[in-house]
C-alpha cells in the first residue's frame, strides 16, 4: 500500500518530470515532481508548526475538485491528519472523522461544554481549508484556512478575511521546502482513502 510518505518520495524522485496535470476553467496547470513535493512539504510543515495540527486530527477540505485540493489533501495526510472532503465523512465531537457534514457536527457537539471537553478528554477541533471563509462550515471550525483557488494566487484575493481566518496561500510560503517530519503521516487516514480508491 502506498502511504502519503511514499507518494512524497516518488514526487521528489521525479524531479523536473511532470507529476500533476490539471485542466480546469482557469486553463491547464502542470507541476513537476519537485514542485509538487515542495508544495506538500510546505503544507505539512505549516499544518504541524503553525496550525499545530495533532496526530489524527480532522482536516476538512471544503473545496471543489481542484489541483490545490489534491495538494492540501496529500499535505494533510503527510501531517497525520484525518482528511475529509466536501460531501465526505466529517469530524465528530472528538475531532476525528465519522459520518456527517463538514466541521459543523463536531463543533456543535462541543458547544455544550464550556472548556471544549468531550468524551472524557480534550477534543482537538476541526481544521478547515476552504475557498469560502464566510461559509457556515467556516463558522463552525476552530481553525479556518482560506485558500484562493486562482492558479497563481500567492495570497487571498477575495473580500477582507474575517478576524482569525488564516490566509493559507500566503502563510504556507514561509514553511520549509523539505519534509521535516517523516513519521507524522502514520496517524493519517491514508489507508481509508486507498481503500475507497480501489473500489
PLM region spans:
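AMP-dependent adenylate-forming
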Residues: 8-31, 170-199
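Conserved AMP-binding/adenylate-forming
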Residues: 46-86, 108-110
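Conserved N-terminal alpha-helix of the aminotransferase class I/II PLP-enzyme fold
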Residues: 21, 35-46
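Short hydrophobic beta-strand segments
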Residues: 19-21, 55-65, 128-130, 199
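Conserved ATP-dependent adenylate/AMP-binding module captured primarily in the ANL superfamily
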Residues: 73, 83-139, 150-166, 171
Amino acid at each position: 500500500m502506498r502511504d502519503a510518505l511514499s507518494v512524497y518520495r516518488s514526487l521528489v524522485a521525479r524531479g523536473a518530470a511532470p507529476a500533476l496535470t490539471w485542466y480546469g476553467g482557469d486553463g491547464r496547470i502542470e507541476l513537476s515532481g519537485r514542485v509538487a513535493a515542495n508544495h506538500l512539504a510546505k503544507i505539512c510543515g505549516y499544518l504541524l508548526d503553525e496550525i499545530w495540527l495533532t496526530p489524527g486530527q480532522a482536516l476538512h477540505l471544503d473545496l471543489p475538485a481542484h489541483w490545490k485540493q489534491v495538494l492540501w489533501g496529500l499535505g494533510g495526510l503527510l501531517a497525520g491528519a484525518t482528511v475529509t472532503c466536501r460531501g465526505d465523512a466529517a469530524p465528530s465531537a472528538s475531532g476525528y472523522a465519522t459520518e456527517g457534514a463538514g466541521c459543523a457536527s463536531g463543533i456543535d457537539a462541543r458547544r455544550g461544554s464550556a472548556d471544549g471537553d468531550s468524551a472524557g478528554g480534550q477534543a482537538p477541533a476541526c481544521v478547515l481549508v476552504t475557498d469560502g471563509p464566510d461559509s457556515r462550515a467556516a463558522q463552525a471550525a476552530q481553525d479556518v484556512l482560506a485558500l484562493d483557488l486562482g492558479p497563481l494566487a500567492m495570497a487571498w484575493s477575495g473580500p477582507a478575511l474575517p478576524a482569525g481566518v488564516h490566509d493559507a496561500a500566503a502563510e504556507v510560503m514561509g514553511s520549509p521546502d523539505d519534509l521535516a517530519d517523516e513519521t507524522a503521516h502514520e496517524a493519517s487516514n491514508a489507508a481509508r482513502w486507498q481503500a475507497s480508491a480501489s473500489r
